[in-house]
Amino acid sequence: MMTVAGSDCSAGAGLQADMKAAHAMGAFALTAVTCVVSEAPGLVRGIQEVDPELVADQVRINLEHFPVSAV
């Protein structure tokens, strides 16, 4: 599977949470990072977007080189 999501430094949301959920179900999660977020429960301090072309390239390379069964 592949998750297309932001990176949450607290691991309570975003691709880190998606990866934990995938692991709990016995799946391996590829990622495409859309943004990096500085946050904690109830607080978002900063968001930095990833260039859309880089996000698209992450998706493409994952699809080209790995068996992706779900997105």
Residue ranges of model-derived segments:
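Residue-level recognition of alpha-helix initiation/capping sites
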Residues: 12-13, 53
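Conserved N-terminal subdomain of the carbohydrate kinase-like
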Residues: 1-3, 19-70
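Short, glycine-rich nucleotide/cofactor-binding loops
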Residues: 3-12
